[in-house]
């Protein structure tokens, strides 16, 4: 765990960045950058001991930020719902601008995505596998571009960098498993790819906080590129069945080629450079349900 460092966290109100910023704030000077558009955003950061800074990364202007951060976790994104050129500028060009602005840092983490990978069927995807064109093409190719931009800047200016390809996060603040839980509770079908089982390696909040901080600590030049996921593989079919047992609801699956292809990451490199995750997926899913639906009595509590 970092101590007595000056840390910049972008996208600081998000479900990934906020828990990391909160964990670091007790022993570090943490600055949280976000657009702060929702009521209570600033107070949420302040209550966690985080210095809240209103800044929109899409502007590409970082002159208002200090340039002496010792560590940076860059999680702010354009999700790619609008103009593709804006998405590339925010996620690639402006990420490079921020990396250069923070070039004095001892470690910088660029948050990429596992969705850049082309689907390879029933096998785990390693960092060496090539990109494809998934359903959210704008977001994915902008992140591939961001990896290239940040790699060039890091190597040219010798800035220690880790690129994490985020695969499947979940916890009290949400994530794809939480979204599927809501669909189950409403009786809605869950769309899945027909090439079953739909394997993932979901990573719970406690673990992604630990491995996110570790990613800053091990940054180097040339950059490290690593899949960021849980150590255990579990299919959507299996984890939805488990959630269904806990809440007393039978999941309904709808298999269609129009659904997202499964994202099953190879975590060999992650285990080597970041370590193993600690929370078993069943324990993590139970915690998520208890946090998001305290009104529910889970199966073994009835």
Which residues are covered by each model-predicted region?
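NAD(P)H-binding glycine-rich loop region in Rossmannoid oxidoreductase-like domains
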Residues: 39, 51-92
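Glycine-rich Rossmann NAD(P)(H)-binding loop
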Residues: 169-171, 192-199, 224-234, 257-260, ...
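Active-site Tyr-X1-5-Lys
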Residues: 134-162
